[in-house]
Amino acid sequence: MKNLGIIIFSAIALSSCHTQKNVTESSPTPISATEPVKSNSAFFSKITEKSTFEQVKINSKINIENGSFIPTLNATIYIENGQKTWMNLTALFINVARGIATPEGVKAYESYNKTYIDSDFSYLNNLLKVDFIDYQALQNLILGKTFIPINDRDFELTQNAQGYTLSSKNNIKINVDSKTTEYTVKSDYSSDFNLAKVTLNNLSNQDQLEVYYNNWENFEGNSFPKNVKIIIKAKKTDQILIENTKFDFSKIATPYSVPNNYKKTAIK
């Protein structure tokens, strides 16, 4: 089930644009300035802008490192802004998984074990070791936009040689089902406000989520990162690397139905 989770998440939650250049943890770290930016309203307004496209189709190659052999996956991702994210995955010319996310939740199936899931967003939250992902946060994560809850009270903005660093000055508290989780958050942005790196630390168990974005390109008024890398650090470390090869704004059909004889899998 964990392999199914990694496959589904990597396709449905982490693709954005096109061409290749690897994203690595050794990317230059911005040198933080000591003085906070006092007039930060323009910055917060810019990084929370909503996407304006109607739909985008993305072709991607996905490599997963999680201790098990998973071949390179070819993914087609289709996003209707604010409504749904659909994906289809193949490996070695064989269809291996398909899924769809909407504001109501996530549905997906995989053909190797003939299993499927039908869940709210607790599935992706469990996989990412967080608890604040809903549909809009998921779409923002896919597109390299700010996907964590932010406000100018709990964050400090500094400017540096590479752009900006937004750091939590107070622990970020997320309350879900009467359970409160606290995080520390640090986000790096380029000088033109493109997201470069996000690091979240769960203070209750020391789980960590890191997301890297690189090689941004503007296409018809929309900015997209060409490469994405995600690292999930818990009892073990999983890494997902995305090479996006093509995108366009055409509409496509997004069929989804679970084949006969597939077994529903409990969320773990």
Task: Put a short name on every predicted segment.
Residues 14-16:
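C-terminal motif of bacterial Sec signal peptides marking the signal peptidase cleavage site
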Residues 18-71, 263-268:
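N-terminal leader/targeting segments and the immediate start of mature chains
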Residues 84-136:
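An acidic-aromatic
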Residues 19, 154-261, 265-267:
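Gly/Pro-enriched, hydrophobic low-complexity segments
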Residues 48-56, 68-71, 78-80, 99, ...:
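Edge/loop elements at the starts and ends of beta-strands within beta-rich repeat scaffolds
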Residues 1-5, 19:
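Positively charged n-region of N-terminal signal peptides that target proteins for export
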Residues 127-158:
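C-terminal low-complexity, charged extensions that often adopt amphipathic alpha-helices
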Residues 5-12:
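Sec-dependent N-terminal signal peptides
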